[in-house]
Amino acid sequence: MRKIIFIISFLIFTSANAEISKDDENKLTNCTGIYYAYSMIPQGQLELDKIVHSIAAKKFLNSYLIEKGVNDEKLNKELLKIVDELYGKPYDENSVKKCDEFIYKTISNSKDEILKIINSGIY
């Protein structure tokens, strides 16, 4: 009986702390960059709720990626590349929807965590 409990505990613990795949890391980094770029669009050019969503999602993903072992400096360099690409371009609703769907599917509880950030008013 002890062996079964130990094995189950081991499986749960190791899967909870599992690293993310390189492909997921790249997609999440790209989405973080998209949110980052759109969070800087002036309020007069984009609805406030979309800007706030972008800020909250960027904040959540940035923390998540660092927590999963992505190097902070490397992440910032990648984000700046993406922001440079998107800066001055119009808001793309489709890319945001794709990122939202991917994040909600890939990271459990991510939708609720992003909503907590939005509702906290602390971006």
Can you say where each PLM-predicted feature lies in the sequence?
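Sec-dependent N-terminal signal peptides
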Residues: 3-16
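Short amphipathic alpha-helical segments and their helix-coil junctions
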Residues: 14-21, 78-83
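Generic detector of isolated residues embedded in canonical secondary-structure elements
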Residues: 17, 30-31, 98
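Short N-proximal segments of mature Sec-exported proteins
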Residues: 21-69
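Compact alpha-helical subdomains of small soluble proteins
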Residues: 49-123
